[in-house]
Design a protein with these regions (language model features):
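Surface-exposed patches in mature extracellular/periplasmic domains of secreted proteins
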Residues: 1-7, 105-114, 172-182
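A sensor for short, sequence-defined functional sites
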Residues: 1, 11, 36-40, 109, ...
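Generic recognition of stable, solvent-exposed alpha-helical segments in well-folded globular domains
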Residues: 46-58, 85-96, 112, 116, ...
Length: 201
């Protein structure tokens, strides 16, 4: 989808006092690069796992929201943010695609993929005491009562992505997948043609 892409990593010393009080690791995607702030560790397998999980997820944001997004994302106001009802799509479906691509590449087995998705079921149930529509959570995620459920966007969003993918494959005899649907929507809307937030889901 892109002719070049740069991964920028910064590994922080876990002994830093500010990070011990409040661990704040993460990553941010851009059209042709992504930047990572991850804990430094001598555990090679742990480091590989963190990098693989995070880098694949951030790279796959080139699908959503970088190339398919609503007006709220296209014209994002950092001073007075208005969130999109599709945050679950941008983060959750991207998370599903990252798990799926790691399974398809052989980096994880089918059993490991099932375990990963099962953990997302338990994770979303743990974080969400009462049922909330994903569009409602996404739109209101900056409000205090919704902030504590932010992780659900990734966990349950990934489960919804898998559900949509399996349903599309079943109903169309494998002719349409979630990825092919997103590619079709990207042709219709695309990075410079954002959709109305209320029309997609």
């Amino acid at each position: 989808p892109v002719d070049h892409y740069t991964f920028i990593f910064f590994f922080a010393d876990m002994a830093r006092r500010d990070l011990q009080r409040r661990p704040a690791y993460g990553a941010l995607e851009h059209n042709y690069s992504s930047v990572y702030f991850l804990p430094e560790t001598t555990e090679e397998s742990m480091l590989k796992s963190w990098i693989a999980q995070t880098a694949v997820h951030e790279f796959l944001h080139i699908l959503v929201p970088l190339n398919l997004h609503s007006k709220e994302i296209a014209q994002f106001d950092f001073r007075e943010p208005k969130m999109s009802r599709h945050l679950w799509l941008y983060e959750g479906v991207t998370e599903y695609f990252s798990v799926l691509s790691r399974a398809q590449s052989g980096e994880m087995t089918e059993k490991q993929m099932r375990q990963t998705m099962r953990q997302k079921i338990f994770g979303s149930q743990f974080m969400m005491a009462k049922p909330v529509a994903m569009t409602e959570l996404s739109k209101n995620v900056l409000l205090p009562e919704y902030q504590k459920m932010y992780g659900v966007v990734y966990e349950k969003g990934a489960l919804l992505g898998m559900y949509f993918d399996l349903t599309l494959r079943e109903k169309t005899g494998g002719k349409i997948t979630l990825l092919s649907l997103i590619r079709t929507l990207t042709k219709k809307f695309g990075p410079d043609r954002p959709f109305e937030d209320t029309i997609l889901f």
